[in-house]
Amino acid sequence: MDNTALKEKRYVGVKETVIYGIANGGQVIGYNLVRMQLTFFLVTVFGIPGTAVSLMIFIMGIWDTMNDPIMGTIVDKTRTRYGKLRPYLLFVPIPLGIATILFFGGAEFLRDVQSTAAKIVYMCITYFIWEFFYTIGDIPFWGLSAAISPNPQDRSMAITSARFISGIIGGLVGPVISVFIDLQKSGKIGIDMRQLFFILGIVAGTFGMALFSLAGICTKERVIQNSEEPKISDCFKCLFKNKPLLLIVCSNVLGTVESIADTFTQYFYLFTLGKASLSIIAGIPGTITGFLAYTFIPALEKKWSSKQIIIRAVIVKAVVSSAIFFIGIKWYRQPTVIVPLMMVWGVFNSVVSSIKMVIPTKMIGDTVDYMEWKTKERNEGTSFSLLTFVSKLTGSLATAVSAALIPVIGLQQVNQDMVLPENGEINTRFLLWAIVTIIPAVLNLLSLIPYAFYDLEGEKLDNIHREIAARREEITKSASAE
């Protein structure tokens, strides 16, 4: 099969593509609560010391270095009539939903408990359970993006659908919490932050997991798999032979610092500008353009390779973020100046974020094809376990660093509230301005270093797709003849 025919033959319809996206939308309600609000929830709402949170996240990071690759190899060894990925997606939504409710209900369940040790124990146990089941669901889900079709365009559309729809559904978490903070401080509502997070946990654990279950119920695996069950040792060997995948992983790790801004954005609007809900106003243009950005990703893929798109996106973000920082450096406490600036910044930031939500995931699918071409074995589970691991690792590192930075930049925890003492020696408001704009974006340029050695693109990648397509045809013909 020539490369043109391979690209033109489509296997996945619009309905299945949309359902795959809706499933991811359900999954990320709980994930975004953890990724964006973990420090705020555990330190400010639950009342757990930041040092304990940082230590737990560090230990969980060590656990993930073993847990994720092991889960990936288990997935790659799975052979059932439902495929090797879908069985996990059929099973995991129920236990993951229960774990989500238990974790975010902790502050409410232990409302009258004074023992910090008891809170820490509850936090560690429930977070471990949540991480465990999240891994069981996340690795097969993203592995499915490479197995849903042999056509790279189908895969790109499935990933784009997942990122687009999850951005809409999961993106509601931040604004809901920002509005609630302002309503609570003004005395307009009668529930507190503990109850809010419990309610959000229930929504994520029931409605969110109901949507996530659609991934196992309504999708198909279409890429032909070797019927022989590989050894766990072989899966690990393939992982370390996959140079393009390891380069993508290194890039993601180096880009960890970019996520720090997520934690401090809430504090910036609350303490520097005086109103948390201003983040919603500032975020409106970016939200719109972020969704629109998904529509022109196919056009970018026609013009540039995936590697070229990523390099350009990271550089643009660094340049724009630096310009915004210096333009607003004299007025960083003036909402009338900063909110419009953050609107402009949000437009560029959201476009770059949309691109980075799709392209690297698609590139991991390319590395799975590369290893099939090189070894005749497909390792979606092992390969995408690294995506899950790195996603959690970078999130955990960012959260741990953020928790450690809170006292360093002058913020203090007083009972259940985060406060900013006036007349301190540290200009906390200015540091928050730098942390949400220039610092993460500039340091993120380090993530481009591994791409200098990445060569799985252009004619090389086209030849690989051509050769494995021919191999699959031969396997199909042989099976039919038998």
Q: Can you name each region flagged by the protein language model?
A:
Residues 2-482:
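Membrane-embedded alpha-helical bundles of multi-pass transporters/translocases
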